[in-house]
Regions:
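A generic alpha-to-beta junction signature in SAM-dependent methyltransferases
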Residues: 195, 262, 274, 287-288
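Mid-domain Rossmann-like dinucleotide-binding core that forms the NAD(H)/NADP(H) cofactor-binding site
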Residues: 90, 154-155, 161-163, 167-252, ...
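Conserved amphipathic alpha-helix within the SDR
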Residues: 254-264
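C-terminal hydrophobic helical "lid"/dimerization subdomain
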Residues: 2-10, 281-285, 328-380
Length: 380
């Protein structure tokens, strides 16, 4: 049995990708409905992330037509069967996480949501949910595939495992960035690095995810948090988020400056938040002996980065990949940190686009014109 409110329309608007040469175009498609273990969310806003950009540009293969958008906030309007006893309710405001654990596989059973095999095999490769089918279709019944929940639409079906209720003091539109930008930042600091109080940190590339890493690392007690980027505009607000120093690596030798700031040692942990060879090199260059480099940024396609073998071996340095976080445990924690003011999610959102402007917004992101995070705001 499903539980729903009666105001759900039969159709909705969605930004659909049919051709990577054309980009996103708004279409009217059928409003989806949740199946077992899922909820339907009326989307208030959807964050705009580089991962979507890789698909839009064709660098990451994905079945088309598709609705992208993988971090949302909104209101539950329908519960699928089996959700009644989870505590989720119609009318509840929630944040939706991009990494949607199936809850049944070996990784999920051991609490490692970030390694959920069905998520990668079904959703990330085939654009479907865990019964092997998409929830989206055109008015004619043509399947439309889902990148995560397909949040660039007025409504989105999300597994109940990937939503967390938000309290009344959380603003829904900016809260859309909690499900990827903040969740990924939290996972990198808490899970990937296992950051300890008093350690020193460098964050290479301070976009939406990098900015969250800066403030979360500071909140977790890092002694120094050094923000590194090639944009003075992006670096300007970093001290307000907890950075103790900033470095423009286009103007200053990042390694030399980090060594100066750390008394010649380098940092205990460096985070790489863009996914290109240059930022990998910088993140490795600033590491101390025994340091941990945590890459978070996804590369385009099968992009590779070089590692200096002897230095990594002789200096006992570690590279610890971090993808998202453990959604069922960590998304509620991220919401709590935002509610308590530890994560400043509102100011990170620098631009709002309407659904019709989604393609324009991703072009601005591609052209590095977005500071922090932009969102598609369904109220516009």
């Amino acid at each position: 049995m499903t539980t729903q409110t009666p105001q759900i329309p039969e159709t909705m608007r969605a930004a659909v990708l049919r051709d990577t040469e054309v980009g996103l175009q708004v279409e009217t498609i059928r409003t989806p409905h949740p199946r077992t273990g899922e909820v339907l969310v009326k989307v208030a806003a959807c964050g705009m992330c580089h991962s979507d950009l890789h698909v839009i540009g064709g660098a990451i293969a994905f079945p088309l037509p598709a609705v992208l958008g993988h971090e949302i906030a909104g209101t539950i309007v329908e519960l699928g069967p089996g959700v009644e006893h989870t505590g989720l309710k119609v009318g509840q405001n929630v944040a939706g996480g991009f990494l949607m654990p199936c809850g049944q596989c070996e990784a999920c059973s051991s609490g490692r949501d970030e390694l959920c095999a069905p998520f990668f095999e079904l959703n990330r490769l085939k654009g479907v949910l865990y019964d092997g089918e998409t929830r989206l279709s055109t008015l004619e019944g043509e399947p439309v595939y889902m990148y995560s929940m397909g949040g660039l639409a007025e409504y989105a079906v999300v597994p109940a495992t990937a939503v967390a209720p938000t309290p009344d003091n959380i603003e829904l539109v900016p809260a859309s960035i909690l499900g990827c930008a903040a969740l990924t930042g939290y996972g990198a600091v808490r899970r990937g690095a296992d950051l300890h109080y008093g350690e020193t940190v460098a964050v290479v590339a301070v976009g939406g995810v990098g900015t969250n890493i800066v403030q979360i690392a500071s909140a977790f007690g890092a002694k120094q948090v050094i923000a590194i980027d090639v944009s003075d505009e992006k670096l300007a607000p970093m001290k307000g988020y907890g950075a103790t120093a900033t470095i423009n690596s286009a103007k200053t030798d990042a390694r030399e400056e980090v060594l100066r700031l750390t008394g010649g040692k380098g940092v205990d942990v460096s985070f790489e938040a863009l996914g290109i060879p240059a930022t990998w090199t910088t993140a490795l260059d600033v590491l101390a002996d025994g340091g941990r480099m945590v890459p978070i940024g996804l590369g385009a396609g099968v992009q590779t980065a070089g590692v200096e073998i002897n230095r990594t071996v002789r200096r006992s340095q570690s590279i610890l990949g971090s993808y998202g976080a453990r959604t069922r445990q960590d998304l509620p924690a991220v919401v709590d940190l935002a509610s308590e003011g530890v994560i400043n999610y509102k100011e990170i959102v620098s631009k709002h686009f309407s659904l019709e402007q989604a393609d324009e917004g991703y072009k601005a992101l591609r052209d590095q014109k977005i500071q922090g995070r932009a969102v598609v705001d369904m109220s516009l």
